[in-house]
Amino acid sequence: MLAIGITGSYASGKTFILDYLAEKGYKTFCADRCIKELYQDLKIQTGILKLLPELETFNIGKISNLIYNNDLAREKLQNFIYPLLIEKLIQFKQENVNSKFGFAEIPLLYEAKFDKYFDFVVTVHCSEEIRMQRATTRSSFDVEIYNKIKEIQLSQESKIAKADFAINSGVDMLDLEKQINNLIANLECRV
């Protein structure tokens, strides 16, 4: 199986493209969804509360606020949760070893050095205006957190430069499908 990492800035369209690929029958893995599942585990909640006692109670909103305003807390949480995420990613790859392609959306792929787990990386990108417009439609939108996320992520330009492929999601659906089909055709040549 070719393992393809999908990354990009906040609200760039990564999940939309991952879900589109899943609808087309490709095997997919979403880091954000996986982490949300991990957070349901009481042992993991307890571990996070021991690691970050200032939280007092396990609350996703509190965690977000803390990690985007406290570099040390973010680093502690990442050091705790990333090995668990890597286990789940490796399990996904093993379970789908006979598939031609496996696509995994990892928002902080380069920042967390997850690129080593992939044969190819795709960066999904669009203009800042479109990203902000998309972000504001989310129920959890907070402009301060949006700006903090931008600060800790590599720039969109850096992610595009590092990637093997780039998809501009700031286009109409027909053009987006064409780009995804071109990506698949390119990957087919590399199997």
UniProtKB/Swiss-Prot annotation:
Biological-process GO terms, alphabetical: coenzyme A biosynthetic process
ATP-binding found in the keyword field: yes
Residues the record lists as binding ATP: 11-16
GO CC annotation terms, alphabetical: cytoplasm
This protein's record includes keyword Hydrolase: no
InterPro entries: Depp_CoAkinase, P-loop_NTPase
Coiled-coil region(s): none
Catalytic activity, as annotated: 3'-dephospho-CoA + ATP = ADP + CoA + H(+)
GO molecular function: ATP binding; dephospho-CoA kinase activity
UniProt keyword list: ATP-binding, Coenzyme A biosynthesis, Cytoplasm, Kinase, Nucleotide-binding, Transferase
EC assignment: 2.7.1.24
Similarity-based family: Belongs to the CoaE family.
Protein purpose: Catalyzes the phosphorylation of the 3'-hydroxyl group of dephosphocoenzyme A to form coenzyme A.
Protein's name in the database: Dephospho-CoA kinase
Organism lineage string: Bacteria, Pseudomonadati, Pseudomonadota, Alphaproteobacteria, Rickettsiales
Name of the gene: coaE
